[in-house]
A protein has these predicted regions:
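The feature captures the beta-strand-to-loop junction immediately N-terminal to the Walker
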Residues: 36-38
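Conserved structural motif at the start of ABC-family nucleotide-binding domains
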Residues: 5, 19-22
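Conserved ABC transporter NBD signature motif
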Residues: 55-74
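ABC ATPase nucleotide-binding domains
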Residues: 219-249
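Conserved ABC ATPase signature
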Residues: 133-137, 141
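Conserved ABC ATPase "signature" region
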Residues: 111-129
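Catalytic Walker B motif of ABC-type/P-loop ATPase nucleotide-binding domains
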Residues: 158-162
Length: 249
């Protein structure tokens, strides 16, 4: 298997509080990983450590295939709450800003950059609001905008933090179908609290609650969740079976 990222003995601390403990995890080129766990369990901290956004101990090794020159080919879609919607920028400009690191020397975007943004906006049904300020669009439209922004630099690994938040039911299905298509050529790591939906989309599950456990399947039993102290609810969505797991003591 082509390993994109090899994590060994990773720990993340905030002041004196250790959020992640001695994590070992491999991420492969064909992965579609669903990252689940309780609030405060370390899901977002794991993502931020991979992105180099938080101090940590241990090692994170990146495959040469994740680089184009010195540029690391990782796309990131943050939680919407981490994005300032009061900033005066349009949907289209937000998408093309995903190329900012590439265009830092010239300081400007090309016609081809905007054409790439327009293609993504059309693919996600946002072309009609391309020039709208982000402060005037819906939560679901903002999620799609951030997804386009994460994709515009053509990453080989896409990391998504709760991508279906605020998205309506119709586009949620389209979103997951798009991600499945993308996974034919890139690896995806998706953080989600909705176990009922995520298990129907991803290939493998990573359970995070201080420690990290990777399952080579998208099926998680109540017993496994209990063993890893991972108190989650499975919520019914359409034909998905309705199962409720009791909170752990």
């Amino acid at each position: 298997m082509n390993t994109l990222i090899k994590i060994r003995d990773l720990s993340v601390h905030y002041d004196s509080h250790r959020v992640l403990h001695d994590v070992d995890l491999d991420i492969y080129a064909d992965d579609f990983l669903g990252v689940i766990g309780p609030n405060g369990g370390g899901k977002t901290s794991l993502v931020k450590a991979i992105l180099g956004a938080v101090p940590h101990s241990g090692t994170i090794e990146f495959s040469p295939s994740l680089y184009d020159g010195t540029r690391r080919l990782i796309g990131y879609m943050p939680q919407q709450s981490n994005f300032d919607r009061a900033f005066p920028i349009s949907v289209r400009e937000t998408v093309v800003s995903g190329l900012q690191a590439l265009r830092r020397m010239s300081g400007r975007y090309s016609r081809e950059d905007y054409a790439a943004a327009d293609r993504l906006l059309e693919q996600t049904g946002l072309q009609s609001i391309a020039r709208a300020p982000i402060g005037e669009i819906s939560g679901g439209q903002m999620q799609r905008t951030l997804l386009c922004r994460a994709l515009i630099a053509e990453p080989r690994l896409l990391i998504l933090d709760e991508p279906a938040n605020f998205v309506d039911n119709r586009f949620e299905g389209e979103l997951y179908e798009l991600l499945k298509q993308l996974n034919e050529r890139i690896a995806i790591v998706m953080v989600s609290h909705d176990l009922g939906t995520i298990t129907s989309v991803v290939k493998n599950i990573v359970c995070v609650n201080g420690h990290v456990h990777r399952h080579e399947s998208n099926v998680i039993t109540a017993e496994q969740l209990d063993n890893y102290n991972c108190p989650l609810q499975i919520i019914a969505h359409g034909h998905v079976p309705h199962t409720v797991l009791e909170p752990h003591k």
